Curated annotation (Swiss-Prot):
Subcellular location: Cytoplasm
Pfam families hit by this protein: GIDA (PF01134), GIDA_C_1st (PF21680), SAM_GIDA_C (PF13932)
Coiled-coil stretches: none
GO MF terms held by the record: flavin adenine dinucleotide binding
Keyword set, alphabetical order: Cytoplasm, FAD, Flavoprotein, NAD, tRNA processing
Similarity-based family: Belongs to the MnmG family.
PANTHER family tied to this protein: GLUCOSE INHIBITED DIVISION PROTEIN A (PTHR11806), PROTEIN MTO1 HOMOLOG, MITOCHONDRIAL (PTHR11806:SF0)
Gene3D superfamilies linked to this entry: FAD/NAD(P)-binding domain, GidA associated domain, C-terminal subdomain, tRNA uridine 5-carboxymethylaminomethyl modification enzyme MnmG/GidA
Major location (coarse): cytoplasm
Protein name: tRNA uridine 5-carboxymethylaminomethyl modification enzyme MnmG
Positions of NAD(+) binding: 274-288
Assembly information from the UniProt record: Homodimer. Heterotetramer of two MnmE and two MnmG subunits.
Amino acid sequence: MIYDYGYDVIVVGGGHAGVEAASASARIGAKTLLLTHNIDTIGQMSCNPAIGGIGKGHLVKEIDAMGGVMAKAIDMAGIQFRILNSRKGPAVRATRAQADRLLYKKAINSLINNQENLDIFQDSVDDLVVENNTVCGAITKTGITFRAKKVVLTVGTFLGGKIHIGKVSNAGGRAGDQPSNALAARLRSLPFRVDRLKTGTPPRIDRRSVDFSVMEVQHGDNPTPYFSFFSKGKIEHPRQIPCYITYTNNETHKIITDNLDKSAMYSGLIEGIGPRYCPSIEDKVVRFADKERHQIFVEPEGLNSIELYPNGLSTSLPFEVQCNYIRSIKGFEKAFIMRPGYAIEYDFFDPRDLKPTLETKHIKNLYFAGQINGTTGYEEAGAQGLVASINAAISIDSDKSWYPTRADSYIGVLIDDLITKGTKEPYRMFTSRAEYRLILREDNADLRLSNKACELGLLSKEDQQHFISKKNAIIENIAMMKNTWIGPQTQKARDLEKFLDKKMTRESTLFDLLKRPEIDYSKLQQISELNLNLQDDAVIEQIEISAKYSGYIERQNKDIEKTATFEQKAIPTDFNYSQVKGLSNEVLQKLTEQKPTTLGEASRIPGITPAAISLLTIYMKKTGFIK
């Protein structure tokens, strides 16, 4: 049966990538269908009940700046908020929020259920309609064909998913859900490179069986921060509660090492590579054998939930071993496990087979986003879903495209890393992956991206107005401060000197004075003659950062300008690299396989030398591809 409602975009999968994808194309105005195997699991947090963290928080802020739903949802559902690295510079500060799982899912559903241009249908997808190497729709398990101009696959860990607990394995996309084996087989029949990855989750513990009195208490920040640029004054956080910290010990490690042969990871049952930066407890004990203990964050799953998430204890050991090592940990001596931990192995597709828009190079109008591309984490998935669906929507009746770059966002860093380098292990975002960290801060994500969001129609009118007002206030106040002078031996100077190490000897602007480490905006406000009445903390923060880091920011902007021309030099998709004399066989093979879209992208492919890029540039200039 063909169910033709004239859809522009079909999104397959209702996880974090799928939700952002479906919401984005619908906001742009594309008629969108979200296909999910179970409507009740839309927006479900399959693993840890948290959003954000180092690098990840930056992605959430950028998704929010583009009108996405993740930040607003966690503001509605967060039960503990913290700014990580708060004592360090603004480039590496990151927001992290503990979530109430049920409230988060409720918030996500509230946001997408009220989204115009979006339909939701429950059925798993078994096949794609592909004609002349172009996707035209999807076929469900019950035999319904949905036709559309674009298809975005956001299928998470469901492709050929296999769950492992010790030496017991069973098919599953996650605990309690069937895998998408038919769709996995269909995708394997297409000309994509495919491999296996592994991730895992810890056992869940009944909080009533835990002794919190012997653990360290970890409170959230006060005042409680917001994740979304648009939430303050509109969304009220739920009640805030603490998390706790405990540690493994020598007994824990002995139990684990004595039973390594029973672990699915170490017995050879699992072929896929696990996440380097979120290893199982077995991996930690083996790889860091010199460590006497490992930190465990004991995280509540919700305000009214009795389940705890022991972050740091992901495992594929048998259930009885899980019980033993859990009860060896301080505070967990009488712990009751409500759900066993497990590892899950699944198919992923080499992201080097994608364009920067996340459209596949081999099948036109088909986009991949999320764990199918080898990433790990809700935030990385959401970011990809956003970009994939933006491009699906804006290219329906034209050849338009938009994708972020390494110079304007962490989303750009994420996508560029994936499509140029690929990945052999689940990819996680860190601030260290970005060259321009001082410019790509959490606090200015809206200033970097919301102009484009307005242009694409991704922001609501209310959010657009909020952004424009904030941006104008920053511009106007910085201009005013650059044009307001204080001379020495004036009353203003005398009032100011109580904050300075030494007396003023020359005339300075307020902006230059703000560059001094001992001066901040609040001190300038104490000089009544200046009439500085600004009360918006977000605007003040941008003014202070612009002043105090002006030299570094200017330097990074110059670096970006130097590389911008190079980045924008497009390489035709049908470019014949064999015509370029002097390229080695290795370089020729890599360029031909990956088909980079720009010279900048080509330069970041592992094994492509500066000399090869020079030869390519010279040839492209000589033949008229570059002017």
